[in-house]
């Protein structure tokens, strides 16, 4: 079964971070609301959630360039906070920095269900694994906060690679570091993690708890929850 799923000691594994390994410790709208209250905002979580989703879809539109950097990512998050709280807080920049720093800390996150068991399996089978995320340099401090994640061979972020998923360049640069043409990408985003990896010639495992029609592709070796993947390989 391990061989069938593309998991073997000769093939390195790259795991997405947010949504796959890590999830926010509390709902994002509630975190935003709690921090914004210190700066005079009175928006409810539902309104914040709506504004967040609208701003996020504009700022990280799939039609935009995948080129990125630490400065670009920080500017994008600043713009998002400004748009969400337009006209409702005294100092949007101060709120932005409070939120930016909050999500750089481990307590802002928790491990997703099944992560510890899956990482233990990789370590037991001596399978090299790395983290590959559309994130910025803050991810390093977050990863260090979780003992289960400290065994990652590398932590790749789009901000440091200069390009984000689903660009083939993102995966090519990681392949070069891992010295392997076809690692296994495990992630929850069909467009960024799965399609991006498959188009780059990688294998992929799609982590999802939703009922979708199975994706037909010879490189897609698994589709389901992380807990189901753990059961399949142990």
Question: What kind of region is each of these model predictions?
Answer:
Residues 1-13, 23, 46, 90-94, ...:
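Asp-based, Mg2+/Mn2+-dependent phosphohydrolase catalytic module
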Residues 2-116, 124:
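N-terminal helical cap/lid subdomain that shapes the substrate entry/recognition surface
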């Amino acid at each position: 079964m391990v061989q069938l799923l593309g998991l073997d000691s000769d093939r390195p594994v790259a795991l997405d971070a947010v949504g796959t390994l890590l999830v926010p410790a509390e709902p994002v709208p509630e975190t935003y609301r709690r921090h914004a209250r210190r700066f005079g905002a009175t928006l409810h979580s539902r309104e914040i959630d709506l504004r967040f989703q609208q701003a996020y879809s504009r700022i990280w539109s799939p039609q935009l360039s995948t080129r990125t950097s630490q400065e670009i990512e920080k500017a994008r998050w600043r713009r998002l906070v400004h748009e969400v709280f337009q006209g409702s807080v005294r100092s949007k920049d101060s709120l932005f920095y409070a939120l930016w720093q909050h999500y750089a800390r481990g307590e802002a996150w928790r491990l997703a269900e099944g992560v510890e068991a899956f990482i233990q399996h990789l370590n037991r089978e001596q399978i090299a694994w790395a983290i590959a995320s559309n994130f910025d340099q803050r991810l390093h401090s977050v990863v260090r906060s979780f003992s289960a994640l400290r065994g990652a061979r590398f932590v790749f972020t789009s901000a440091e690679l200069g390009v984000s998923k689903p660009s083939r360049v993102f995966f090519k640069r990681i392949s070069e570091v891992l010295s392997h043409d076809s690692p296994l990408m495990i992630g929850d985003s069909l467009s960024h993690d799965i399609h991006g990896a498959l188009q780059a010639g990688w294998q992929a495992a799609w982590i999802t708890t939703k009922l979708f029609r199975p994706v037909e592709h010879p490189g897609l070796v698994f589709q389901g929850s992380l807990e189901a993947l753990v059961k399949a390989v142990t």
